[in-house]
Design a protein with these regions (language model features):
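Hydrophobic structural segments
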Residues: 1-259
Length: 259
């Protein structure tokens, strides 16, 4: 099948109009009419990931985070993005990104997180007007649990070295709001809908203040909160193209390390 068929299937699941205004989802590099030899699935595009795709003989990379996010004024070798562009073109490897459109789609990134947390009665945290889509989710655990014990379980489940949190007013929680990635913009909304705890990937230092009488706040880490997006990509492609060779990257692209 052609690369454009794969892009079409991804966009049927997560339409590009669902992406945020600042985003740049879709085909980033490549010729849509080329036959696809295989797809490497990743969170971030790096030179090492492109080399991995080349070694596998794959000519498509499907990533969550766009390589081309801000304007590129030249293609040399002075930045990581420029080097990735050159390498992808040299190796004839197409790059496709499904970012906030996949975050906002039903069944997308946040649903992947909610399923692993065992949440029920899911609803959009911040619905997009007139669409069955939105930013974040809110749901319930089957029964109230001790918040610190639950966070310790989540830390282990998501492979987190350090989970950041601020306690809320109640030791037990049941109603959970969540958003993968950088979700501090939804803290107030989580409080408005009565969440006992809001879980996201990143929260800036100052945003942890002022909510201790409303809800617990917890940050997993951006990479850790979205790492299962690769599983979602694999299911989507296998369901639509069972004969297409796919592989999850073996490279951890998280640039943050812990001592």
């Amino acid at each position: 099948m052609q690369i454009q068929e794969i892009a079409r299937a991804l966009e049927n699941f997560a339409p590009l109009p669902l992406q945020e205004g600042y985003d740049n989802a879709g085909l980033q590099i490549g010729i849509t009419g080329n036959e696809c030899s295989g797809a490497l699935l990743c969170l971030d595009v790096t030179e090492a990931v492109i080399e991995e795709a080349s070694r596998l003989g794959f000519n498509l990379i499907v990533a969550h985070h766009p390589l081309l996010f801000r304007g590129v004024k030249c293609v040399s070798d002075s930045t990581q993005v420029q080097r990735c562009i050159r390498l992808a073109v040299q190796r004839d490897i197409a790059i496709y990104a499904a970012h906030t459109n996949l975050d906002n789609a039903r069944g997308g990134v946040n649903f992947e997180i909610a399923a692993r947390l065992g949440l029920q009665k899911l609803d959009w945290l911040s619905p997009l007007p007139g669409k069955d889509a939105g930013s974040g989710l809110v749901g319930e655990l089957p029964q109230p649990v001790d918040a610190q014990h639950w966070l310790a379980t989540v830390k282990q489940q998501f492979g987190v070295d350090a989970l950041l949190y601020t306690p809320g007013p109640k030791p037990q929680i049941q109603r959970i709001a969540l958003c993968g990635g950088a979700g501090e913009f939804l803290i107030d909304r989580a409080a408005e809908v009565g969440a006992d705890l809001y879980l996201t990937g990143e929260i800036g230092y100052h945003h942890f203040f002022g909510h201790e009488n409303e809800l617990w706040l917890a940050a997993l880490g951006h990479y850790q909160s979205e790492r299962f997006t690769i599983d979602l990509f694999e299911r989507l492609l296998r369901n639509n193209f069972p004969d297409l060779p796919t592989a999850q990257t073996t490279i951890c692209t998280n640039p943050i390390h812990y001592l």
